[in-house]
Amino acid sequence: MSAIKTRFAPSPTGLIHLGNARTALFSALGGDVFVLRIEDTDLERSRAEFVAELMNDLRWLGLDWQEGPRGAEPDPDWYQSRRGEIYATYYRLLEEKGLAYPCFCTPLELEVSRKVQLGSGRPPRYSGRCAHLPADEVRRRHEEGLAATLRFRVPKDRVVEFEDEVRGPQRFAGEDIGDFIIRRADGSPAFFFCNAIDDALMGITRVLRGEDHLANTPRQLMILAALDLPRPRYAHISLIVGDDGAPLSKRNGSRSIKQLREEGYFPEAVVNMLARLGHHYDSAELLGLPALRAGFDIRRLGRSPARFDVSHLDHWQGLAVRGAADDTLWHWLHTETRAVVPDAHRAGFLDLVRSNCLFPKEADAWARILFTDELELAADIAAVAQAAGEAFYLAAIDAATESPDDFAAFLAGLKRRSGAKGKHLFLPLRAALTGSLDGPELAKIYQMLDKPRLHRRLAEFTYESE
């Protein structure tokens, strides 16, 4: 069996978000050779910095490509904006075959025609007004400098059929499509034209993309057939929706890969979440890319919308944090956090992070609670601490002095001296020492708080501190 070649072909007009990151992931998992192509024909919006960002995002996710550009400098092999001569050759071939023609209709004329068709209950498609202009009329209009698009001629009796690897048999009637634009009036190629040409010339054998591109497929298949170019297999994956059922957007939870990285998500967490958005894996464990690739089956891709839930992402983040090696976890922390953690408590602090934190900012908060004097108690937390009374804290100071290194002995001494137990013991103690009512085990906190700092925090709730 020949190698399956897939591709990811983003437009560098912004940052990569979850939807196109999942497309890239499924494309990488669903083939033997993964190609990156830059579709930058929108010259006004395409930016070199977005190319650099998307390459950085893909590499961070572990999705390196076997073929494609290695830098943001435009390369005619992989950047569509540099392949105009190639597309021009195929435009000429279509015109010579009589399968494409110039259209001089203005945007206003097309809009009027569209409204008339909609008003009469018909689906809007091109009327064919310029389809049979005499050659001398076409020449005259060109000489007058009239702008023209180039349209592909679609026979009304043409039927396009193909087997979608996700959605099954597909059938489109030519009369429902109409003659469509393959080159804009400014000379730039239409998306589905250069997209199809490049897929053929680059040997792409499987195209995985969002279901919103399904309607482009019959157009591309007609173009490829007209030019005797090979056609790939198509797999149109479900779209991602937010928790409100609407397409995922900034409004309902979408974030860029760059934003997730800056928030401290591990790439393994993002990849595992994306891999299960619309695809089933038997394993519920955090899987590496080799295991995800081994378990990927295009027949397991669902047709229903894939619902994004940030709690699922955070679940995978928790597994990634808990499974991270010490050195990885240490360098995941903010530089400022590492600076305040004493070497003697590094291993213990990392153990605390694994059990209690999802993000570096949370770890930073605990580092400052444990290793600095930056503790401030909110009014409700202070009220819990104060409710225990002065005698409780005097007893705690005595117990800590007696058992500075043994939390179990400290706790037994505090119980004996104060008579407190259960929540009346643990809640005020936690509130006074950490400024919180939940968090890491008190035994870990007791071991990491240096004893002068611990004594000062307990003394804050005695009359001696006033």
Swiss-Prot record:
Keyword terms, alphabetized: Aminoacyl-tRNA synthetase, ATP-binding, Cytoplasm, Ligase, Metal-binding, Nucleotide-binding, Protein biosynthesis, Zinc
Motif ('HIGH' region): 10-20
Residue span of motif 'KMSKS' region: 247-251
A single GO cellular-component term on record: cytosol
Listed InterPro entries: aa-tRNA-synth_I_cd-bd, aa-tRNA-synth_I_codon-bd_sub2, aa-tRNA-synth_I_CS, aa_tRNA-synth_I_cd-bd_sf, Glu-tRNA-ligase_bac/mito, Glu/Gln-tRNA-synth, Glu/Gln-tRNA-synth_Ib_cat-dom, GluQ/Sye
Family under the similarity heading: Belongs to the class-I aminoacyl-tRNA synthetase family. Glutamate--tRNA ligase type 1 subfamily.
Subcellular location: Cytoplasm
GO MF annotations in UniProt: ATP binding; glutamate-tRNA ligase activity; tRNA binding; zinc ion binding
Reactions mediated catalytically: tRNA(Glu) + L-glutamate + ATP = L-glutamyl-tRNA(Glu) + AMP + diphosphate
Binding site residues for ATP: K250
Cofactor: Zn(2+)
Enzyme class per UniProt: ligase
Entry-linked Pfam families: Anticodon_2 (PF19269), tRNA-synt_1c (PF00749)
Chain residues that bind Zn(2+): C103, C105, C130, H132
Organism of provenance: Methylococcus capsulatus (strain ATCC 33009 / NCIMB 11132 / Bath)
Protein's recorded name: Glutamate--tRNA ligase 1
Task performed by this protein: Catalyzes the attachment of glutamate to tRNA(Glu) in a two-step reaction: glutamate is first activated by ATP to form Glu-AMP and then transferred to the acceptor end of tRNA(Glu).
The keyword Nucleotide-binding appears for this protein: yes
GO biological process, one term: glutamyl-tRNA aminoacylation
Enzyme Commission number(s) of this protein: 6.1.1.17
Subunit structure: Monomer.
Entries under PROSITE patterns matching the protein: AA_TRNA_LIGASE_I
Cofactor: binding details: Binds 1 zinc ion per subunit.
Major localisation: cytoplasm
